C-alpha cells in the first residue's frame, strides 16, 4: 500500500513539475515572441525615423541648394547691372571729357588766330608807319641837300663880290644847315628830345614834312616845320 502511494505522489510531483516546466516554457516563448515583436517594431520605427530624417535632410538640402542658386543668380544679375551702369557712366564721362577738351582746343585756336590777326595788323600798321617816316625823312634830306647845294652855288657866285668875312659867315651858315638837317631826321623818327623839338619846332605837336625857302640878297634859310 505504501508503495502505491509513493508512486502516486511521485507521479503527481512529476506531473506538476512537467506542467510547471510547460508553463515556464510557454511563458518564455511568449516573452521571446513579445521581445521579437518589440524588436521588430523598434527596428521598423527606427527605419521609419531614419527614412523621415533622411527625407527631411534631403528636402532641406534641396531647399538650401535652390536658395543658394537663386541668391547666386540675383547676385550675378545685380553685379551685371552695376557693371553695365559703371560702364555707361564711364563712357558718358569720357564723352563729356572729350567734348570739353575739343571745346577748349577750339577756343584756344580761336584765341590764337585772333592774336595772330591782331599781331599781323599791328605789324602791318607799324611797318607802314616806319616806311612813311623813312620816306618823309629821305624826302626832307633830299630837299635839304638840294637846297644846300643851291645855296652854296648862289653863295659862291655872290662871293666873288664879297669879302673874306662874308665867306666865313657863309661857311658857318652851311654848318648850321647841316645840323638842322640832322635834327630834322631825329624828329622824323621820334628820336629827338622834347627840348630839341621845342627848340627846332616850336608850337608843333605832330610830325609834318614841309620845306620853306626864304631868299634875300645875302642870306637863304631852310627850315622844317
From Swiss-Prot:
Which UniProt key words apply to this protein? Cytoplasm, Repeat, Stress response
For this protein, the record's Gene3D superfamilies field holds:
6.10.140.1430, Helix hairpin bin
Protein role: Involved dehydration tolerance.
> In which residue ranges is the amino acid composition biased (Basic and acidic residues)?
28-39, 49-61, 71-83, 93-119, 154-163
Q: This chain belongs to which protein, by name? A: Late embryogenesis abundant protein 29
UniProt record, GO biological process: response to cold
Induction profile: Transiently up-regulated during prolonged dark.
Q: Give the family, as the similarity comment puts it.
A: Belongs to the LEA type 4 family.
Compartments annotated for it: namely:
Cytoplasm, Cytosol
Q: Could you tell me where the Low complexity compositional bias lies?
A: 205-225
Query: Compositional bias (Polar residues) spans?
Result: 141-153
Instruction: Recite the lineage of the species.
Output: Eukaryota, Viridiplantae, Streptophyta, Embryophyta, Tracheophyta
First and last residues of every LEA 11-mer repeat repeat: 53-63, 75-85, 97-107
Query: What GO cellular component is one of the record's annotations?
Result: nucleus
| Top-level lineage group | Eukaryota
Gene name of the encoded protein: LEA29
Q: Quick one: where's region Disordered?
A: 1-167, 193-225
